[in-house]
Amino acid sequence: MKKAVLCMVTLLLCLCAIAAQAQALTLTGLETESVAREWENHAFFERMRELTGVEMEAHGIEDEAEYRKMLAAMEGGTITADVLFKASLSREEEIGLLNSGAIIDLAPLIEENMPNLSALLSAHPEWKQVIELEDGRIASLPQLTQEPRQVCVWINSAWLGSLGIDMPRTVDELTQALVKMAGADLNGNGKADEIPADLLGVYEMRWLLPFFGVIADDYNVAREDDGTWVFAPELAGYREFVKTLREWYELGVLPRKAFTESHGAIALAGNDNDTVVSGLIVAVAPYTNVPGSAVFDYAPLLIADPDGQTRWRDLLGGVWTGCFAVTSACPDPASAMRWADALYEQESAIVAYAGVQGEDYDINADGYWYFLVDNYRTINDIRSNAIIYTGETMHGFVPNAFLNRVDSEQDRYVLENSAKVLAVSERVVEPYALGEQTRARLNELAASIGSEVDKGIARFVTGEMELTDENWESWLSGMREAGSEELTALLNAAK
């Protein structure tokens, strides 16, 4: 009798376990894709259920204000979902949600439930440092990649060829090349509409800084060889950078409305959209600024600095945090983590990026993959119903080996050149170097000082303020008073 009762109890426990595993978890997040995408009926979630055995009842929120309002309500105790996917959490939001008890610390769950992510973090301990808070807690899961796309300075090499000019190796050679572009009808439309340095505002102009030996980030700080952080405008190379921009402005290389107009706005106002007007651009890919047919006319420009070193700034790095979180309302955090772990395995991650082979994409005889589109199913249909990585950033390990084999010569060309730039790129300030209070103060200082940096550069370049020793020192002095020295002191204390 006792044996029968024991067997019955065991059976009931097993049935309860099965029921718990079969219970669908509720999932929500921010969806910013431009095409309509309904998570409730999206193929991705059913395919993930087939891969993991974990079912998600998904609902995407398209209005960012509504989504941020939901996050604020979570901090106040109103939790309406078990999982946040494409969560778009800032570090401040992560900390607030954790401290309020709205989301749980994922650190204790990773090793047991996420073998794929565990292996990646073991191989790249620096990645773990980025996702951990200063107390060791982990609020969210990241997107990881070994090949982060690079912002590049692209130069119109076709125009260089037409002018009989080699790829510039120095800033002086670059200036000479751009001056020659300004005086030639290189697009052949009979108009003087060429823009040699088609740069939009100070942000894009700052991507020229590595040519002057300055690798600076959005805090306007640079790192010396000994690891010490300095305020970038204090460096000699920074003044040379501003001096060169002033020269370009006077020579007509930099357009008069460089600080007020969008890319090629003046020229394109009177031209066909297929007309190439740009000599030098800053972009991840040329086709974001110029006609797609002209992509192969552009090559990334890397110029050695005065010390002979070729260096670049890696904008994003290999880790993007805030992508996936588990709420305190989740009845089965382990299952949520197992579901999430599938996207840290390359083959499984392809489901999010390209769908299923034979249904959404296929591979040709040359080994390149392509989407299966026809008169009845467009690429927008696939974006809407099959893939989900576009829009807000999702967690997982980007399947670069697969994506790099796309059946698009333009995309492969851009990816190959991005990899070349990545090889000489470096991060300036790693996020894990900063504690909560330090980061908050740095952001406050960077906002006020950054505005003064941009305004000062614009005034020097346009000639509103003459570039003299006195004016330069006065500008630097004003930024010291605004907190530039405190900015670098905070960073150096956090090393």
What are these regions (language model features)?
Residues 20-173, 207, 216-221, 226-233, ...:
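Conserved N-terminal structural module of periplasmic/extracytoplasmic solute-binding proteins
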Residues 23-27, 52-56, 77-82, 102-104, ...:
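Loop/turn elements at helix/coil->beta-strand transitions in domains of secreted/extracellular proteins
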Residues 31-32, 342-462:
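Conserved small-residue motifs centered on glycine
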Residues 95-96, 202-219, 246-396:
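Extracytoplasmic/periplasmic substrate-binding proteins
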